[in-house]
Amino acid sequence: MGKSIGIDLGTTNSCVAVLEGGDPVVIPNAEGERTTPSVVAFDRKSGERLVGQLARRQAVTNPERTVYSIKRFMGRRYNDVKQEAERVGYQVVPGPHGDVRVRLGDKDYSPPEISAMILQKLKRDAEDYLGEEVTDAVITVPAYFEDAQRQATKDAGRIAGLNVKRIINEPTAAALAYGLDKENDQTILVFDLGGGTFDVSILELGDGVFEVKATSGNNHLGGDDFDAKVVEWIVEEFKKAEGIDLSRDKMAMQRLVEAAEKAKKELSSTTSTNINLPFITADANGPKHLDLTLTRAQFNKLTADLVEATAGPVRQAMQDAGLKPGDVDQVILVGGSTRIPAVQEKVKELTGKEPHKGINPDEVVAIGAAIQAGVLAGEVKDVLLLDVTPLSLGIETKGGVFTKLIERNTTIPTRKSEIFTTAEDNQQSVEIKVYQGEREIAAHNKLIGNFQLVGIPPAPRGVPQIEVTFDIDANGILNVGAKDLGTGKEQKITITASSGLSDQEIEQMVRDAEAHAEEDRRKREEAEIRNNADNLVYSVERSLKEVDGKVDSSTREEIEKAIKEAKEALAGDDIEEIKRKQEALMSASHKLSQVLYQQAQEQQQSGSSGGSSDEDVVEDAEIVDEEDEEKRDDNR
């Protein structure tokens, strides 16, 4: 059995951690960084897949084939994300089931496929760091993620070749990381503002039990929205100054997105920042340059509505938990966007507490996931995690009413059954429509699945007894069953999004991902072979110059021929040919090594036979301490 890791699959950045000797450790990626950009790109010319920092670096020149913030589209229907789709540089299109697809060149990818590419890199980097295979993972999701979004995340893990042992909520993971070594009972509020989502969770910690009392949030609020406000401001300012609308230029917009994010980060530690983008566009008069100054006060004004939008979920979570601000012992900030000073001030205003800043908001969620992975693997003892379902779940009953079976903030796993009956005489089937939400009318909530129970014997309405059972597992994923108690006939479904991927699609994606992983390994091996051959050519050429005139002409010709053939092979694409020519050059260079060795021996012998002159021999020496030296200096 391989190693188990904890993964924070973020909107902007992702992070992976592992337990080593009982302590959680953040795993650096291949580039040496502790977080990896959640960005995937395909090179326009070669089609090569790039993930992480490499993908982010080329985003400006390749905006249509660079995918970022894919988490915003996970488990969502196309009609629900049209506004978000307009804000990204890549093409978002409807899929075959009304779901979301990303069109890159001539191929459409599902959001779980793109996320799987990020997970594959995290898995590979973890394996390189640990020196062993990674098979299992605990992956985090926003607490307010719906059932379909959780299922999509699990699908992404499966496509990446990971056995997803558990899906846990990000605020809960943060609390786990914070509270593992705390002995006293505490009530904590986790304020999690990431790149694309916002969550608030209230937990009680005591005796190794982490119990979530309430959770609330907004899946459409995050750092991306703050960046978008700055981008809108830049576009307007440039339009006023130059009369040019940059929003129509995809390459320029990608530069603006990066500049906006940079400005946002800088304004967390300084009161003003300069946004300088030379050659942003051009008109008939020549190139145009963008040079603007954004102050923190202006930024706060631009984003005031976003900061205010965090207040509602905080108050809702407190109300659901039956708490007043004074009942909260500690406030933990999670997510890079909590570094924004106005956000921190808002948290202080809402809770009356100075937020705890002793943990890295970019890493704490992955650390918590690694601890939970350790709990599931038996490496961490005496820790119990009790999470909750974020939204109420129920079915549509007569008159379009939403009848709740499981209330929001119910501890999971949980199971609930209720008896229903038919609405019409001689009704022989019932359609069970499953909804998620808080509205009284079913149609105002989100339909997450439906199925038919057939074969009910004809009877007057109200006579048949149909037992409907809702079962939520520890991942927050729902199973629904309906049973006719009269006949024993039963129908069950696991709720996946109506826009979800089928098992066949996932299996195909797993095979594609494995093929890509093999392709990546092969490319790495090919690069190593090329590098080794190139280094050999360089060192043999240099050595040949060093022994100029000391190698007979036939040996020189043989080596020069081998060098020439190796260079020709390196110019081509045949890796086997490169290997053959490298071996031939290695063999030819052995004679050169003999000459160099012989030359070194001769130099050594001539050096030792020369001996030493009397002037070089030290017969006696006087040792003088510092005080005597000072006296001598004074006497001079």
UniProtKB/Swiss-Prot annotation:
Keyword Nucleotide-binding among record annotations: yes
- Please verify whether the record's keywords include Chaperone: yes
Listed A to Z, the keywords are: ATP-binding, Chaperone, Nucleotide-binding, Phosphoprotein, Stress response
Per the record, where are the segments of Acidic residues compositional bias? 613-636
Q: Name one GO molecular function term.
A: ATP-dependent protein folding chaperone
Residues carrying Phosphothreonine: 197
Instruction: Name the InterPro entries for this protein.
Output: ATPase_NBD (IPR043129), Chaperone_DnaK (IPR012725), Heat_shock_70_CS (IPR018181), HSP70_C_sf (IPR029048), HSP70_peptide-bd_sf (IPR029047), Hsp_70_fam (IPR013126)
Q: What segment(s) does the record annotate as region Disordered? A: 596-636
Report the CDD domains cross-referenced here: ASKHA_NBD_HSP70_DnaK-like
Q: Under what conditions is it induced?
A: By stress conditions e.g. heat shock.
Q: What does this protein do?
A: Acts as a chaperone.
Which protein is depicted? Answer: Chaperone protein DnaK
Q: Which organism is it from?
A: Rubrobacter xylanophilus (strain DSM 9941 / JCM 11954 / NBRC 16129 / PRD-1)
